[in-house]
Swiss-Prot record:
Chain positions recorded as pyridoxal 5'-phosphate binding sites: G76, R77, W102, T156, D175, Q198, N240, T241
Keyword line: Amino-acid biosynthesis, Aminotransferase, Cytoplasm, Pyridoxal phosphate, Pyridoxine biosynthesis, Serine biosynthesis, Transferase
Sequence positions bearing N6-(pyridoxal phosphate)lysine: K199
A Pfam cross-reference name: Aminotran_5
Name the record gives this protein: Phosphoserine aminotransferase
Task performed by this protein: Catalyzes the reversible conversion of 3-phosphohydroxypyruvate to phosphoserine and of 3-hydroxy-2-oxo-4-phosphonooxybutanoate to phosphohydroxythreonine.
Catalytic activity: O-phospho-L-serine + 2-oxoglutarate = 3-phosphooxypyruvate + L-glutamate; 4-(phosphooxy)-L-threonine + 2-oxoglutarate = (R)-3-hydroxy-2-oxo-4-phosphooxybutanoate + L-glutamate
Gene transcribed to yield this protein: serC
Binding site for L-glutamate: R42
């Protein structure tokens, strides 16, 4: 069977080596004679797995000791709610920077749940010569007392990425669902980081939360216990039964990434992949991208065909060439190629070759 390259934005492809290992030990994990899906989450074998997973993630991201690492339910949308409930209190105030669909969704959830708390927002994307560009505000010039400022460094729908680390006088809360471990960041700059697993970590259903000690002292709203960061810390992410199989696969992905040389190594590969695909788009008037070069996402490359009537043919022929899940999000249309850590260079090279051939055939 020839390789199929899956460009889905999430759930995304997992590393082949991880999938093969999971297949091999699916029915007999750690010599126990049962699947990892069947063992107790409080058994010594699974506890050892969780401790190794946290240690590996801390090593990969250089997470300081004054941060807690949580493995939680609910994905990114669950964290939209959890952030508000854990940090705002009844009289708090927060700022949301809006750069695309996902930061807009986080803002909408905050406004829904805030009650007497105040939610402010700033749109940080503007048009420059017809292209979307991020313009970060000088937050130090804003006269306000915010509990936190929230932003999303990578917008999967819009194909926008913010590479400059935010400079803020208030704690930064960041949705890294689609960019976590794709490039190096300074974790110590953040009050809280959260990420749904289904792009660069593992299967859907799991979310990672990295929270600084002092954030847990902020007043909280009345909230559900299952999304209470303080309870999650107290119970080592096991206040209730966690998504154990997703946790297991995340642990295997961390080990795989370490074997490649860590985040610094995969970041170089990710940069190569994105440059290869954007070069193809820029070199051919048959394709167009709507984002300024400085904010083009490395993880989610969005593009349109000059002749939209060929969209269906493009997707059909791409699938026949074993290049799947290239349809853009329903909100923006066009095409989207997601190049998460598990996507090999060979997959992007195959896509570029196909795009050149398709353009030549239909020009």
């Amino acid at each position: 069977m020839s390789a199929i390259y899956n460009f889905c934005a999430g759930p995304a492809m997992l590393p082949a080596a991880v999938m093969k290992k999971a297949q091999q030990e699916l029915l007999d994990w750690n010599g126990l004679g049962v699947s990892v899906m069947e063992v107790s989450h409080r058994g010594k074998e699974f506890i050892a797995l969780t401790k190794q997973a946290e240690a590996d993630l801390r090593e990969l991201m250089h997470i300081p000791q004054n941060y807690h690492v949580l493995f939680m339910h609910g994905g990114g949308r669950g964290q939209f709610s959890a952030v508000v409930n854990n940090f705002l209190g009844n009289q708090g105030r927060a700022l949301y920077l809006v750069s695309g669909q996902w930061s807009s969704a986080a803002l909408a959830e905050a406004q829904k749940l805030a009650g007497d708390a105040q939610i402010d927002s700033l749109n940080i994307v503007e048009k420059q010569n017809g292209l979307n560009a991020v313009v970060l505000p000088d937050l130090h010039k804003i006269d306000a007392d915010y509990r936190y400022v929230h932003y999303c460094p990578n917008e999967t729908v819009d194909g926008i990425e913010i590479f400059d680390e935010l400079d803020s006088p208030w704690p930064i809360v960041a949705d890294l669902s689609s960019t976590i471990m794709s490039r190096e960041i300074d974790v110590s700059r953040y009050g809280l980081i959260y990420a749904g697993a289904q792009k660069n970590i593992g299967p859907s259903g799991l979310s990672i939360v990295i929270v600084r000690d002092d954030m847990l002292k902020l007043p909280s709203l009345t909230q559900s216990s299952i999304m209470d960061y303080r309870l999650a810390v107290e119970h080592d992410s096991m206040f209730n039964t966690p998504p154990t199989f997703a946790w297991y696969l995340a642990a295997e992905v961390f080990a795989w990434l370490k074997s490649l040389g860590g985040v610094a190594s995969i970041a170089k590969i990710n940069q190569q992949k994105a440059q290869m695909l954007y070069a193809c788009i820029d070199a051919n008037p048959f394709y167009k991208n709507g984002v300024v070069a400085a904010n083009r996402s490395q993880m989610n490359v969005t593009f349109q065909l000059a002749d939209e009537s060929l969209d269906g043919a493009f997707l059909k022929e791409a699938e026949a060439a074993s290049l799947v899940a290239l349809k853009g999000h329903r909100i923006v249309g066009g095409m989207r190629a997601s190049l998460y850590n598990a996507m090999p260079l060979e997959g992007v090279a195959a896509l570029v070759s196909f795009m050149n051939e398709f353009a030549a055939k239909h020009s």
